[in-house]
């Protein structure tokens, strides 16, 4: 994922309010009286969320499958440990006060058994709290569904076509980017992605089965209670 277009990824996330999401997370950390000295960020990408939690005095580790994205992240932060690894293959060797993952990284894990194992692995190495978000079934089925979208931003034009497979609880994203070059020609970059539709109850069950004693779920966009139309749900687990 994000192979060729890693270098334009930051520009393509212009409409994501990272600061708002970080404030929701910080509010939940404050409620639990957790001031983490060690942080593990899963699916760190190019570090767009990282800047709201990182400082050089922390033991900060980030994991991502994309080497290209990690190279961008490494240019932004010093004194940070970056691991190029599939989350489901990750072997954690130390404990962390705070483990988190944002922007539907969990939805990209298509095998429920692998996700269950990941949660168990995280529980064993989490001394404080684990937080992550998912795209809800409402968003993936009702909002995204079999729809298509067209976007234009600065020198980038792109189309986004979805295909939802109800029997498999999967949704494919077919994204075509057209990036304007200096000579006014366009470079086409195609990216195909797949997300799994997980019910909130199924995720909750896996978390309890992994050993977490408490699981709280809120609307990540509002920081408040879940609604029928919640598109992004934040899980707080400890």
Name what the model sees in each region.
Residues 1-45:
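Conserved class I S-adenosyl-L-methionine
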Residues 47-89:
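Class I SAM-dependent methyltransferase SAM/SAH-binding core
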Residues 91-98:
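A short acidic, Gly/Pro-enriched loop at the edge of an enzyme's catalytic core
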Residues 102-104:
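Residues lining the SAM
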Residues 116-129:
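A short glycine-rich, Lys/Arg-flanked "PGG" loop and its adjoining helix->strand segment in the class I
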Residues 134-202:
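SAM-dependent methyltransferase
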Residues 196, 200-238:
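C-terminal lobe and adjacent flexible extensions of AdoMet/dcAdoMet transferase-like proteins
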């Amino acid at each position: 994922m994000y192979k060729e277009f890693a270098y334009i990824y930051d520009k393509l996330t212009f409409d994501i309010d990272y600061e708002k999401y970080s404030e929701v997370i910080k509010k939940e950390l404050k409620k639990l009286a957790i001031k983490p000295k060690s942080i593990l960020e899963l699916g760190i990408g190019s570090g767009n969320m990282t800047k709201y939690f990182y400082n050089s005095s922390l033991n900060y580790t980030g994991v991502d499958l994309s080497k290209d994205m990690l190279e961008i992240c490494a240019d932004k932060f010093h004194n940070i440990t970056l691991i190029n690894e599939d989350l489901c293959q990750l072997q954690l060797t130390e404990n962390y006060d705070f483990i988190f993952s944002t922007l539907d990284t969990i939805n990209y894990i298509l095998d429920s058994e692998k996700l269950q194992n990941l949660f168990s692995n995280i529980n064993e190495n989490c001394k404080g709290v684990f937080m992550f978000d998912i795209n809800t079934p409402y968003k993936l089925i009702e909002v995204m569904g079999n729809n298509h979208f067209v976007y234009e931003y600065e020198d980038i034009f792109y189309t986004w076509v979805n295909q939802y497979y109800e029997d498999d609880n999967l949704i494919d994203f077919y994204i075509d980017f057209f990036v304007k070059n200096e000579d006014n020609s366009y470079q086409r970059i195609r990216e195909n992605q797949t997300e799994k539709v997980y019910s909130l109850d199924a995720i909750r069950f896996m978390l309890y089965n992994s050993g977490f004693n408490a699981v709280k779920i809120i609307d990540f966009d509002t920081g408040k209670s879940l609604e029928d139309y919640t598109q992004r749900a934040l899980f707080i687990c400890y």
